[in-house]
Amino acid sequence: MNSLNKEILRLALPSILANITVPLVGIVDTAVAGHLTGTEAAVAIGAISVGAMFFSLLYWNFSFLRTGTGGLTAQAYGAGDQREVAKIFWRGMALSAAVALLVLLLQWPFLKVAVLCTQASPEVEALASQYFLIRIWAAPATISLMTFSGWFVGMQDSMSSMWKDLVVNGVNIVASIILGRGIGSWPGLGFAGIALGTVIAQYCGLLFCIVVCLVKYRRVLGAFRLSELRQALSRSELGPYMRMNGNLFLRSVSMLGVYIGYPLIATTMGDMLLACSAVMMQLLMLFSYFTDGFAYAGEALVGRFIGARDNVSMRRSVRYVFIWSMSIALAFIGIYWVGGVPVLRLLTSDPAVVQACSAFLPWLILMPPVGCAAFTWDGVFLGATASRPLRDSCVWAFVAFLGVWFVLRWLFLDSGTPDVVGDSGAVFPDPSPTVIPGPIGNLPLHFLMVAYFAHLAVRTVWLSAKWKSIRDL
């Protein structure tokens, strides 16, 4: 194995390991909520789900703090410019503090709007609101950790990023169990303890990152004096940085539109297809936990080699990262092809749900190649700080997602609804444009899967076409 492949694995494997722990937090929180005494399990689990969705809506909009910091830091690192590396860090921290303050100030208006957009029961809304109003106080830590994550990636330091995630997720799991369920003779705090556990975990992660910077990066960060921060935040220096982050913000909003639109559309299809859509998305996102590790490696190496003006190594790193990413895609195609039904049985013990989901297994075989390509290109373009193609690809992907869904719905569901063959053989018009009985009753979710595939394909094709605009940087 050559040195570049070793470098890719050094950067990717810690990220993959950290990513694998992410779903464990949600599983544990759900399990704790489902076993609380004095609270109906369905209400508590539903409140965790709704509350988590509130924070996804909120924090995903600020993911540009991570993505914008990573590429810039990697380029400064590659150029050997320690002062620029430090300036990017402190500017990111200042912006994170400002964003966190804004989030805390707007927590009540945001919550009111978010609750209005849900169709949950009053009991679920009340618990979800309680969860939100506790967990929101982790905002300063959570938003700062986004900047730390990007900066560590740019510094080619995936180990610190991994340990940060392991600390956050590990503390979250332990704290939520203890605070929610209690320990020994102490009964715990109940539902509020789950939210408080997340708050404690985020601040533990922040403390860990501060210690890492003091021990490992004190000299690097000392290359930039805090007295110079005003100049770094001036209009002349902040302008290009904010334009790039503005593009990345629009990218985040477009992606959020797809990943919020998918479950919202699925809620119109009835309980069985809604359950199938949730299972399919979990399996579709599973391979992204692995691919993202190589996307982060691509981001770090592309930025570093661009900063070092080493175009040959930059192109080689992109080629090798894609080989690793496509290997992940092929592995998951094999897993879904050979073990699709057993994998479904791991997620649900309901035979009816397993049988219904099996109709959508072909999508699990089609998605990995185009999905892995889209995610890997994201890392490459982030490393090159080419925010405009990233913005455009996601905006058009969102348009494609909605366009494909509504066109297919209009052509086959809303108008010209199929007929239903009755027991006597007589043909009756189907009164429902959404839930179609009979052998083609799965069409709505198939159409939604087509729309999701189209969104990934647009991202892949768009960025593939734009590769020539950055390969000679």
Where are these regions (language model features)?
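Short alpha-helical transmembrane segments in multi-pass integral membrane proteins
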Residues: M1-A12, T73-P140, W186-G246, V302-M367, ...
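Small-residue hotspots at the loop-to-helix junctions and early N-terminal turns
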Residues: A42-M53, F132, A195, D271-L286, ...
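Transmembrane alpha-helix boundary and packing residues in multipass membrane permease domains
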Residues: S15, N19, A31, G71, ...
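Transmembrane helical elements of multi-pass membrane transporters/channels
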Residues: R10-T30, I134, V167-V168, A201-G205, ...
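Helix-terminus/linker motif at the lipid-water interface of multi-pass membrane proteins
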Residues: I20, L24-G46, V115-P122, I178-L189, ...
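N-terminal transmembrane alpha-helices
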Residues: S3-A31, H35-T39, A52-G68, L72, ...
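Small-residue-rich hydrophobic transmembrane alpha-helices
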Residues: I45-L105, T142-S161, C276-G340, C372-T385, ...
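Short runs within selected transmembrane alpha-helices of multi-pass transporters and secretion channels
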Residues: S63-R66, R135-G154, S161-N169, I194-I210, ...
